């Protein structure tokens, strides 16, 4: 006897309690225990979250093809993020969210027109005529100003150029400095000599 045939015989002899589900029924083989007086009817339900199997969300790929997001792999999502300059780490849902927000922001930016003020063109009907006299006057004046400004600048003389010898006050300062350093140098060896006390 095969196992499937044995299962049918058992299910026919012992009618089980029907487990009501959203489209399926199931006969449980342990229903003899539940048929005792006082046993209650058992209903088994399978609750499944209501996620849509298909979504109409799509992305515009680089080559302008529209592809639904179910077909995207993590590798393709990372390539899309890289091409848009977005962060590459995270889960598939994070990558999708980044792409969605980036695409929605770029669509908003492209739909908003920026009204730039038109550049005004200045049209000159009559060109300005310049005579040689105007050019020569202008050139002469600028050269003249440059020459006069060079002549009026004061020349600063450095002390080395003016005085090649020492002044009397400089001699006094150097002589005093030399004497103080000699005194200090002579006093130092005397202080360092050990004194012997008897």
From Swiss-Prot:
Coiled coil: none annotated. Residues 69-103 form the SAP domain. It is a single-pass membrane protein. The keyword Membrane applies. It comes from Saccharomyces cerevisiae (strain RM11-1a). Its main location: mitochondrion. PROSITE patterns: SAP. This is Altered inheritance of mitochondria protein 34, mitochondrial. Residues 1-55 form a transit peptide. It is found in: Mitochondrion membrane.
């Amino acid at each position: 006897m095969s196992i499937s045939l044995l299962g049918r015989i058992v299910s026919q002899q012992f009618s089980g309690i029907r487990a009501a589900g959203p489209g399926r029924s199931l006969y449980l083989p342990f229903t003899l225990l539940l048929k005792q007086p006082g046993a209650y009817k058992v209903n088994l339900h399978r609750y499944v979250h209501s996620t849509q199997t298909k979504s109409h969300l799509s992305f515009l790929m680089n080559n302008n093809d529209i592809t639904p997001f179910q077909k995207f792999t993590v590798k393709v999502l990372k390539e899309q993020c890289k091409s848009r300059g977005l962060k590459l780490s995270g889960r598939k849902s994070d990558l999708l969210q980044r792409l969605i927000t980036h695409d929605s922001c770029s669509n908003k930016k492209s739909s908003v027109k920026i009204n730039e003020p038109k550049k005004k063109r200045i049209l000159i009907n009559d060109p300005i005529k310049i005579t040689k006299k105007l050019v020569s006057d202008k050139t002469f004046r600028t050269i003249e100003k440059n020459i006069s400004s060079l002549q009026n600048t004061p020349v600063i003389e450095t002390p080395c150029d003016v005085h090649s010898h020492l002044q009397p006050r400089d001699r006094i300062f150097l002589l005093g400095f030399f004497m103080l350093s000699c005194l200090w140098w002579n006093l130092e060896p005397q202080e360092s000599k050990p004194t012997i006390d008897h």
